[in-house]
Every structure is written in C-alpha cells, then in structure tokens.
Amino acid sequence: MNEEYSLQDLLGQESELQFAFFNNQTAWKLGCQLKKIAEDNSTLVAIEVYAFSQTLFSYAMSGTQLDNQIWIKRKRQTVLRFGHSSYYIGQYNKAKNREFEQQVHINADDYCAHGGAFPIRIKKCGLVGVVTVSGLPQREDHQMVIDALTDLIKSVQKS
C-alpha cells in the first residue's frame, strides 16, 4: 500500500466508481461494507456516509476519538466543495508544490486535503454525497473506501 496513485488514477476511480442509483438503503450497505472491512482487518476507524444533505450512516469503532469525527467533517466538506476525493485534492496540491490548507481561500478548520473522503455520484446525475473514513494513514483510508465502493457497485450491478 505504499505506492502512490497518480492524479490520472485518482480521476479514473472517480469516473469508474459511480452508482446507477443511490438511496438510504445503499448508504446503509456501503457503511456496513466499510465496517466489515475494518473489522476483518482489525483497524480502528470512524465511518460516515453522507448523502442528500444528511448523514445516513455513522459508526465510530471502539478506540476511535472525537478527532476522527472532526477529520470526517473536514474531509467531507472538501469533497462537497471541490467535487473530488480528498486524496485527489491533496495529491493535486502536492503536485503544484503547495499546501492546500495554507491557501488564502481555505479555512483549515473547515477543510483538509487528506485521503479518506470520496464523492458519491449517480451516473448521469452527479454528486449526491460523500463516503468518508478516518483513522488510518490517508492512503489507507482512501483505499478502504475504494475497496468498499468497488465491492458494493459490483454487487448492485449483479442484482
């Protein structure tokens, strides 16, 4: 898991990992999928699935802290504002040799460019929400979300 994704890879994930439909039940399944991945790997994370202007799934594993919820909020806000995964935003700014949180138009209390938040998109519709994980190094938070989305989208397409 040490290999970095290229910006092109990250944009490809965003293009590929879109739902044909998404509702409250889908949000619940996505949250449960993330919880299962975390438990199977004995990782301590906080999870949020936010869509349609509300939190549809939230879970904090025993051992997580309030800080994880604060990170979730900041990551989510970044995706909602910029329309890309929080990991992409961080890598994009890194490629530009700048710190995202130090830019004049960014309030670091509200936004952060650390991996773990990913846009929830409905094909031919657009951004409807954000799925976020906090508790691991940013690359691993991002990968956990990618794994859960990949599994869920495949299972939904089969049914």
Swiss-Prot record:
InterPro entries: PduO/GlcC-like, PduO/GlcC-like_sf, YBR137W-like. Pfam families: HbpS-like. Transmembrane segments: none annotated. PANTHER family: PTHR28255, UPF0303 PROTEIN YBR137W. Belongs to the UPF0303 family. This is UPF0303 protein Ping_1243. It comes from Psychromonas ingrahamii (strain DSM 17664 / CCUG 51855 / 37). The lineage of its organism: Bacteria, Pseudomonadati, Pseudomonadota, Gammaproteobacteria, Alteromonadales.
